């Protein structure tokens, strides 16, 4: 069974890969509308990854896994 932390870490990786793929698609296209669409999608996936990363940090804090410098 997967822990919440593992699930969130997997989502961060997945969303980051989706954002990177959309960025590549945007760069590869000659059509300005297609570029804008893929760029917007990449931004959304990046925001999702950031939110999941924030959730991961909160889970670490709650579980006591975070060490503060």
Regions found by a protein language model. Give the residues of each.
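Short, charge-rich amphipathic interface segments used for partner binding and complex assembly
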Residues: 10, 21, 28, 32-69
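Short amphipathic alpha-helical segments
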Residues: 16, 20-23
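Short, charge/polar-rich alpha-helical segments
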Residues: 1-16
């Amino acid at each position: 069974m997967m822990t919440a932390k593992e699930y969130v870490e997997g989502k961060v990786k997945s969303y980051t890969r989706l954002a990177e793929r959309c960025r590549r698609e945007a760069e590869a296209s000659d059509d300005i509308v297609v570029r804008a669409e893929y760029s917007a999608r990449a931004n959304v996936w990046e925001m999702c990854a950031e939110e999941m990363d924030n959730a991961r940090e909160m889970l670490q804090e709650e579980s006591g896994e975070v060490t503060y410098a």
